[in-house]
Amino acid sequence: MIDLLLPLTDIHRHLDGNIRAQSILELGHQYNVTLPARDLEALRPHVQVTKNEPDLVSFLQKLDWGVSVLGSLDACRRVAYENVEDAVKAGLDYAELRFSPYYMAMNHKLPVAGVVEAVIDGITAGCRDFDTDIRLIGIMSRTFGTEACQQELDALLSQRDRIVALDLAGDELGHPGALFTSHFRQARDAGWHITVHAGEAAGPESIWQAITHLGAERIGHGVTAIIDPRLMTHMAENGIGIESCLTSNIQTSTVESLDKHPLVHFLRYEIPATINTDDPAVQGIEIRHEYEIAAPLAGLTAVETRKAQENGLNIAFISEQEKQQLREKVLRKRGTA
């Protein structure tokens, strides 16, 4: 269960994986994009997981329709704004939204730097209108290769003060982290935090690589850490967090079933592991589902679920002062200061 006196966070949430089906339909019409269906219910199976996908790449294809309708920078601004509204409606007190500007730009050949600026504009307007706190993590989509990732990084660096961290996502098996060491050196030089998708499609060596070569402070998914006790000890001792996404890992067939998910073991190993959504619109779930349905099925006790909720703020990419201010704000709103 969710502890209402603690801030509720989602620190692994893809902006470009959370484009509303209704918005896809409307933007598709606006920008003359031929979609696989003309009404909402017929479109839904194409843009939302209805059964578990055979692998990560198949799952990621569900995201493609969402970005296919981003026909202008205004469209990017709109979906960013709607992401903030969705986060607030989900009950989140704090979220880190991650996005790949190259992925969002490529279908309509939008300027990548312009996409970054449009997303920032949409998030800023949303935070103002809905009185919430959202931070942005830039993604390099490794699937498109090192050169495209450098374009993406350059665009993100042009707004370096509005981005809190850099991530690497996409085809983990085909494009290992070692190819991107220079990119992450630039990110660290810019003062950014580092989180990396690793140990989702590949083994624990991918997580080691993210930590030792790329400087990862947090690992996205990280499920294969469970087969390397030395790695788990290293992560626990060094406070390297795991951004767990329970339902997502089942839908991508990364983990066979929730009762076999390693999150509970990570928590018992004292790794600062957290509960997150991943791509809510594509998955057809929200953060409450992860806490109230997925976590118990994954074997977490109420105490362990609360610990994961605490971890979400503890390893967030904001200052200790900002974390304390958020705790106090939640207590004022839902309890007693």
Swiss-Prot record:
EC number: 3.5.4.4
Reaction equation(s) it catalyzes: adenosine + H2O + H(+) = inosine + NH4(+); 2'-deoxyadenosine + H2O + H(+) = 2'-deoxyinosine + NH4(+)
Annotated site residues (Important for catalytic activity) in this chain: 221
Manner of cofactor binding, per the entry note: Binds 1 zinc ion per subunit.
InterPro entries linked to this entry: A_deaminase, A_deaminase_dom, Ado/ade_deaminase, Metal_Hydrolase
Cofactor(s) listed: Zn(2+)
UniProt enzyme class: hydrolase
GO MF terms, alphabetically ordered: 2'-deoxyadenosine deaminase activity; adenosine deaminase activity; zinc ion binding
Keywords, sorted A to Z: Hydrolase, Metal-binding, Nucleotide metabolism, Zinc
Recorded GO CC terms: cytosol
Binding positions (Zn(2+)): 12, 14, 197, 278
GO biological-process terms attached to the record: adenosine catabolic process; hypoxanthine salvage; inosine biosynthetic process; nucleotide metabolic process; purine ribonucleoside monophosphate biosynthetic process
Domain of life of the organism encoding this protein: Bacteria
Chain positions recorded as substrate binding sites: 14, 16, 170, 279
Catalytic center residues: 200
Database matches in Pfam families: A_deaminase (PF00962)
Listed NCBIfam families: aden_deam, PRK09358.1-1
Family: Belongs to the metallo-dependent hydrolases superfamily. Adenosine and AMP deaminases family. Adenosine deaminase subfamily.
Role noted for this protein: Catalyzes the hydrolytic deamination of adenosine and 2-deoxyadenosine.
Protein name: Adenosine deaminase
The organism of origin for this protein: Pectobacterium carotovorum subsp. carotovorum (strain PC1)
Phylogenetic classification of the source organism: Bacteria, Pseudomonadati, Pseudomonadota, Gammaproteobacteria, Enterobacterales
Gene: add
